[in-house]
Amino acid sequence: MLSVAARSGPFAPVLSATSRGVAGALRPLVQATVPATPEXPVLDLKRPXLSRESLSGQAVRRPLVASVGLNVPASVCYSHTDVKVPDFYDYRRLEVLDSTKSSRESSEARKGFSYLVTAVTTVGVAYAAKNVVTQFISSMSASADVLAMAKIEINLSDIPEGKNMAFKWRGKPLFVRHRTQKEIEEEAAVELSQLRDPQHDLDRVKKPEWVILIGVCTHLGCVPIANAGDFGGYYCPCHGSHYDASGRIRLGPAPLNLEVPPYEFTGDDVVVVG
């Protein structure tokens, strides 16, 4: 009987072992006991009593939202009222703060401002990139002492008669002019008394048909225009200096003739300047 009461599970608290006297030759193994009178339970006032009223206050009064998916356990989401939703008021423009007003009217203005900011930023970045690239390339260029000793070789067969061709030499424009016979005779016939900077034509050339000059005006350093001016030679558009076909100043504010660089002919059609 005791073993049955022990294995009764949840019914064990309400079961008890008793014995009764049965007439027989054997003496009872267990003395009969009188069940004790149960004491009245004492309630703990600090613990909440589980009643219908207390449980009804904890019950969910709103509809539940259940989510079920494949390979995931089912879950129930209760409604939360303590979540603060950001409104991004500080990041929005004044034209679109009013949710009841259409933002299409201010769309063009807002797009124009965005395009303007993008264009200005692009120009600034391009200018900064240009400076960086320029400095990087300049660092790989030849030094000043190397440029000072630089020479340039010119093929004279590429310059037709009566034409002037410009080159770059030591950072300056270099004019090479193939003169006609008429120009040679006219420049040789000029009297030195008519010149501001007297110099004979034959003193400025090694071959009469070739004139080699540095294309920098002796007034303020502008670059003259070839085959222009009152004397058919060179004309400075900055302040109106006129040079003849030999590079001598004839009219205007320039004080000196165009400079003749050092050069030598290494062949009939090849000249080396420098």
Curated annotation (Swiss-Prot):
Record key words, sorted: 2Fe-2S, Disulfide bond, Electron transport, Iron, Iron-sulfur, Membrane, Metal-binding, Mitochondrion, Mitochondrion inner membrane, Respiratory chain, Transit peptide, Translocase, Transmembrane, Transmembrane helix, Transport
TM stretches of this protein: 104-140
GO MF annotations in UniProt: 2 iron, 2 sulfur cluster binding; metal ion binding; ubiquinol-cytochrome-c reductase activity
Places the protein is found: Mitochondrion inner membrane
Family from the record: Belongs to the Rieske iron-sulfur protein family.
Annotated binding of [2Fe-2S] cluster, by residue: C217, H219, C236, H239, S241
Protein name per its UniProtKB record: Cytochrome b-c1 complex subunit Rieske, mitochondrial
Cofactor: [2Fe-2S] cluster
